[in-house]
Amino acid sequence: MRYLLYFFLILGIHNAQVTGLNGWDLFIDPGHSQDENMGINGYSEAKEVLQVGLELMDILNSQSDIDTVYISRTNDNQSVSLYQRTNYANTVGASWFHSIHSDASSNTNTNRTLLLWGQRNNGNPDPPVGGEEMSSFMIDILTQGMRIGTTDSWGDCSFYTWSDYCANSGGPYLYVNRNTNMPSELSEEGHHTNPAQNQLVMNAEYKRMLAYLFFWSILDYHGINRPFVG
């Protein structure tokens, strides 16, 4: 499959700890709950992104000196509201918030990546800033690693032009961007309505590859060299 080269490279990574994240922590938010947003082949967005989030948590804890990794849910039985997610992140005072999702479309041929960062209605990033820059790393690495097209990285108010929510409220548009006290962004890792993509994400190694793409994005954002591959 197309992702095998990336997975074999991942297998060659030495498990030496990456340094440079000490004092920084991350709140991972696997979107939705239980079996929500069913994929075209019967594998839901909620189950997919939970496993990617847990893999990312494991990679960060085992391969870096990151201070703490938090996660909004840990199993497929939990039902977690948007308020519970953001309130948890704010209560623990996380340095960063990242929400993992997959996208949906009525066109089953569509399969693209997307990053959405918090934006005010005036076009400026929502403070505290950082989501826009992190998204610029994530969108490139995620798209290249998945080898699919992209809708690019957008401020959420600029993306949801069909809604007048930002004009009336000032923004951001997305709840998780609007109600977190730290820099944040939301990723869409392809479309679960695309048959080939929904089949790929059933594979545990593919989900771990997606987690590595987020890990590498975080390292690149911090200017930290990626682990040696070979």
Language-model segment annotations:
Residues 17-133:
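Catalytic-core regions of hydrolytic enzymes
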Residues 3-14:
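Sec-dependent N-terminal signal peptides
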Residues 49, 60, 89, 138, ...:
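Structural element of the ATP-grasp superfamily
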Residues 54-66, 90-94, 102, 139-148, ...:
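Sec-exported extracytoplasmic/periplasmic mature domains
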Residues 27, 34, 99-107, 154-229:
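Active-site-adjacent mobile loop/cap segments within catalytic or ligand-binding domains
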Residues 131-169:
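Active-site-adjacent substrate-binding region
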Residues 49, 131, 135, 203, ...:
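Short, charged, low-complexity patches
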Residues 67-69, 149, 184:
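Hydrophobic anchor at the start of a short beta-strand
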